[in-house]
């Protein structure tokens, strides 16, 4: 990853990953986050081009700021997670719409959309 970030030194970089490196505030999901997240952030802090982090695994749309980095997640096209902050296990939502994200890239700009599906 370091080599690729170095090669993209003059570009804005959006990093995609399955497990989030950031905490979500949802205890059960935070237990499943990237195991070496400290190493991950130590690595990307050496570069000024990382602009946004996008991850899966959460099965909920959310965005925020963590360690100085903007992040986004999207709903799943399959099943959603119940929004519980103090749960020790993941629980699937019943009857909640599926969804997905669309990222429009336009040169050095980007826009992130969230779309729900019945």
Give residue ranges: language-model regions.
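His/acidic metal-ligating clusters that form di-metal
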Residues: 1-70
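Binuclear metal-dependent phosphoesterase catalytic core
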Residues: 43, 65-118
């Amino acid at each position: 990853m370091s080599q690729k970030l170095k090669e993209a030194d003059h570009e804005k970089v959006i990093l995609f990953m399955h497990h989030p490196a950031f905490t979500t505030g949802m205890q059960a999901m935070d237990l499943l986050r990237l195991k070496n997240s400290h190493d991950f952030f130590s690595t990307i802090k050496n570069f000024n081009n990382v602009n946004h982090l996008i991850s899966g695994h959460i099965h909920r749309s959310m965005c925020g700021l963590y360690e100085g980095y903007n992040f986004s997640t999207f709903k799943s096209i399959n099943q959603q997670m119940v929004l519980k902050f103090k749960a020790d296990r993941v629980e699937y939502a019943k009857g909640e719409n599926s969804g997905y994200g669309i990222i429009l890239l336009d040169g050095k700009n980007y826009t992130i959309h969230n779309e729900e599906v019945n």
